[in-house]
Regions:
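Conserved acidic, metal-coordinating active-site core of Asp-based
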Residues: 40-113
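Residue-level signal for secondary-structure boundary elements
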Residues: 14, 28, 58-59, 91, ...
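Conserved phosphoryl-transfer catalytic core
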Residues: 9-43
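Short, small-residue-biased leader/transition segments that mark boundaries at the very start
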Residues: 3-8
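Charged catalytic cores and adjacent phosphate/nucleic-acid-binding surfaces used
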Residues: 96-110, 114, 118-205
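Residue-level detector of short coil/turn "hinge" positions at structural boundaries
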Residues: 27-29, 57, 138, 165
Length: 205
């Protein structure tokens, strides 16, 4: 299964490079793979490679340089602008079935919780209820992406379902330099339920 997923990702990366080149970026796939060092080559890494070498310079990169409109967090902004779902370099990847992923997490002693569902399913937040139906044990309700409306939807949903409520900053180091560890939007009304969820996690088998 792991080998199959790696092959799928390799093909997707090749198609991503092809699409970026068609858009006008002088992407060198081999250079990105070398920088990845055997790890997954992400769009954030593509941006880092291009922004760190004048050989890749193009006016298309200007917004992501220091002082540019998207230069505050250039790597993740590049991904959001070009690689996110619906963007011009997005390549659909056929990952494992969701229920198989849930089973795999449980089989290895983990607890399946959906991270930042409001970011992944913006405008389709009700998908989160289906994810709980099919095995997720909780939702990340508080983070740096969910607005007050989304929090107002996810928090009561988790409470009604008796699911786990979690929080997270989504800190990614240099990829998201404006996000610090432990910093996230929060609503004090749900503190007691969040603490109860944390206590449950400590005693789960």
């Amino acid at each position: 299964r792991r080998q199959r997923q790696m092959c799928i990702r390799d093909r997707a990366f090749g198609e991503t490079v092809h699409r970026l080149r068609k858009l006008g970026f002088a992407v060198d796939g081999a250079a990105v793979l070398a920088a990845a060092g055997g790890k997954l080559p992400t769009l954030e890494l593509v941006a880092e490679v291009m922004l760190s070498d004048a050989a890749y310079d193009t006016p298309l990169l200007a917004p992501y340089r220091e002082g540019g409109a998207r230069g505050d967090m250039p790597y993740i902004n590049f991904y959001l602008d070009y690689g996110a779902q619906g963007r011009p370099a997005f390549v659909p990847v056929d990952f494992m079935d969701y229920r198989d992923a849930v089973a795999l997490i449980r089989d290895n002693g983990g607890v399946p919780v959906v991270a930042h569902p409001g970011l992944n399913f913006r405008g389709r937040e009700r998908v989160a209820e289906r994810l709980l139906d099919f095995g997720a044990e909780g939702l990340e309700v508080f983070n740096n992406y969910h607005d007050t409306t989304q929090i107002g939807y996810f928090a009561p949903l988790v409470q009604r379902r008796g699911a786990l409520m979690t929080c997270g900053s989504d800190f990614h180091g240099k990829t998201k330099p404006l996000i610090g560890i432990g910093q996230f939007r929060f609503d004090d009304r749900f503190e007691s339920y969040l603490r109860a969820s944390a206590a449950r996690l400590l005693v789960l088998p």
